Amino acid sequence: MIGVAWMVIAASLLGCSAFAEVTETFKIVNWNVLYGFNHKKSVKQGANWIKKQAADVVALQELNGHNQVGFKELASEWGHDHAAILKKGGFPVGLTSNKPIEVIERRVKDFHHGYLHCKTHGIHFFVVHFWPGKYWEADWILDKTAPLIERGEKVVILGDFNGNSRKDEDFLIANATLRKRDYTFVDKVEAKGFVDIVHKHDPEAKISQPSPITIPRWTKDLKELKLKRYRIDFVFADKSFAEQSHSGTISLAREIETISDHYPVIVEFNGALSP
């Protein structure tokens, strides 16, 4: 009895830390950074914003002007020692992580922008930048994910979809009157059981693009901007892994508006993951 009493006292003094299960949080940021962070004018500001998020994995699109060496150096500014970029030139996508990255495939052939398939933290990441109307790009990637999911692997598809979600339809009809609605990419992904993490946790988050940085080059004024705003940037997780998610949203921070025309997607999962 004395031994049990001492255990109870010790547990209370330690805040029960020795007896409680520790739950880790895993954080992902996905962001289209507008021609390499506003045509490379806002690289430092973009890196600083990412650093403040303290994410475990960062997926980026439109890394124009960056190559593998430079991208790895840039990733170190937000505390990531590991980075992979799709290609040199054009509109590359990339992935950074605070754990080692295994590059499984860099696919450019037959794609408009291409995609990057990497594994880090025990998760398969497909970083995409779909081209409007090329729906078979999604089919190709989904064919790649099918055997992974059958084996019980964790899979995330994330990036700029250049398409919409039917879950946003009411918002789109009422607000994005200057946009055409195209649900095909998202329909295909959801038909395979993938879960839209932002909609799961923050169904009111309907805007990921454009920001006021598009004025006046691509947008006349704020009035027109409001009629163009919609959500085309997504993080999808396979059904099983999605059960571990505990938050998902889109940051509309004012500082983003001098860095990119897209707003970043931020999602978090519970539980310790594999290295």
Q: Which residue stretches match the model-derived regions?
A:
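Active-site surface patch of divalent metal-dependent phosphodiester/phosphate bond hydrolases
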Residues: N38-V108
